Amino acid sequence: MTTPAITKTRFAPSPTGFLHVGGARTALYSWLQARANNGEFVLRIEDTDIERSTQAACDAILDGMNWLGLTWDEGPYYQTKRFDRYHEIIGQMLEKGTAYKCYCSRERIETMREEQAAAGLQQKYDGHCRNLAARETNEPFVIRFKNPLEGSVVFDDHVRGRIEISNEMLDDLIIQRTDGVPTYNFCVVVDDWDMGITSVVRGEDHINNTPRQINILKALGAPIPEYAHVSMILGDDGAKLSKRHGAVGVMQYRDDGYLPEALLNYLVRLGWSHGDQEIFSMEEMKQHFKLGDINKAASAFNTDKLIWLNQHYIKTLDPEYVASHLAWHMEDQNIDTSNGPALAEIVTALSERAKTLKELAESSRYFFEDFTDFDEVQAKKHLRGVALEPLTLVKTKLAALTEWSVSVIHQVIEDTATELEVGMGKVGMPLRVAVTGAGQSPALDLTLFLIGKDRSEQRISKAIDFVADRINS
């Protein structure tokens, strides 16, 4: 009895741009297929397009994968470092007669295609050099795969079902260019074979490559992996996803204040479902994910849904963990957190209102920095002459405290209102504007507690002076 092969998947981006949401979703599905089956996940950088590939794009891909937490078991492998292996296999194919040198000039190929188009025929290589005898020449040549002339390629796609392509529709694919560089479709085949890939998850734009790659695998005597070609992501208007819909690099989502858990949860549901469940932890994704449950129809990107998920995770994840991500935004916004409350306390205090970590960081600034001016509208409304007495009394009571806690501060605010025989709002609103500079904050007792005793007293004094100047002006 033979032991079943371990499930092995790969994510193989080309480093010609950032890791966008479509690529990130493909990476997630491939990663989940491996993790759900106790398998292995390989990261491979397909950089054979030497002119367009950049190190910056490579770095962006790795940064995006790391930020998302999509860890890999092997790699990253780089195709440009495997040219010797590709040339070795091409040499073997030339010897076996499954590949051949093609000396057709560019002009001949163009003329051939024009004639085929004029005759209403499919434009494909006509096999002119397919059976040429070996010859010694300095003429430039490409190397082509000798595709079968009869029969068809059949494979069962997990998303699209049974697919059959006649070999008559396929031409003899170029597997090595005139400059000696192997082509993408060939390198992919050798890599998948060498790396033992059992499951290929990729975008539907690759589906036309699959029968060509299967034929090369058969010619090499290599096993055929299973395939799942996922549909494209559209904008909410039904058009192809673009920057105006949110098609930006994964790291831009970090910069905009999204948690990786929110983006992963959003992406997994963008074409896959498990009942009516909307919220998925990574463990739940691994538990329930199956390639066969991926939807065939294209999915529409909805930023509002992503924001909703982000709010959920900001509110429900461990505050210490959220704070570890918030720290990046505090630094990015030049907020010095060394003189103020712990970031986890800020997360707990502000998470109910925050849509993003970027927004949360900006709204927390007054906990760490003294503001120059009060909000003009709020000051005009609440820092008036009638606020002088409650601000003065509450400052006196706060200054006398020997214990600084939320409950004690709350009692001071209540006692001030009782003593002055006014409603809590007559004390609370001027006090809130005094210590935050604005009209919104978490619960006032918690806000003062987090700002701290000395800083709170200083700000109330500033507000008292502001009101006094206003009375005297």
Swiss-Prot record:
Q: What is any one of the record's Gene Ontology cellular component terms?
A: cytosol
- Residues noted as binding ATP in the record, renumbered to the chain: K243
Subcellular location, record wording: Cytoplasm
Gene Ontology molecular-function annotations: ATP binding; glutamate-tRNA ligase activity; tRNA binding; zinc ion binding
> What reaction gets catalysed by this protein?
tRNA(Glu) + L-glutamate + ATP = L-glutamyl-tRNA(Glu) + AMP + diphosphate
Please name the Gene3D superfamilies in this protein's record: 1.10.10.350, HUPs
The record's keywords, sorted A to Z, are: Aminoacyl-tRNA synthetase, ATP-binding, Cytoplasm, Ligase, Nucleotide-binding, Protein biosynthesis
Q: Where is this motif: 'KMSKS' region?
A: 240-244
Keyword Transcription on this protein? no
- Entry EC no(s): 6.1.1.17
- Tell me which domain of life the UniProt entry assigns to the organism this sequence originates from: Bacteria
Motif: 'HIGH' region; annotated at 13-23
Q: Which GO terms describe its biological process?
A: glutamyl-tRNA aminoacylation
Which PROSITE patterns is this protein grouped with? AA_TRNA_LIGASE_I (PS00178)
InterPro entries (UniProt xref): aa-tRNA-synth_I_cd-bd, aa-tRNA-synth_I_codon-bd_sub2, aa-tRNA-synth_I_CS, aa_tRNA-synth_I_cd-bd_sf, Glu-tRNA-ligase_bac/mito, Glu/Gln-tRNA-synth, Glu/Gln-tRNA-synth_Ib_cat-dom, GluQ/Sye
Q: Name one Pfam family in it.
A: tRNA-synt_1c
Identify the main location: cytoplasm
PANTHER family linked:
GLUTAMATE--TRNA LIGASE, GLUTAMATE--TRNA LIGASE, MITOCHONDRIAL-RELATED
Provide the function of this protein. Answer: Catalyzes the attachment of glutamate to tRNA(Glu) in a two-step reaction: glutamate is first activated by ATP to form Glu-AMP and then transferred to the acceptor end of tRNA(Glu).
Protein family membership: Belongs to the class-I aminoacyl-tRNA synthetase family. Glutamate--tRNA ligase type 1 subfamily.
Describe its assembly. Answer: Monomer.
Under which name does UniProt file this protein?
Glutamate--tRNA ligase
Which species is this UniProt entry from?
Answer: Shewanella denitrificans (strain OS217 / ATCC BAA-1090 / DSM 15013)
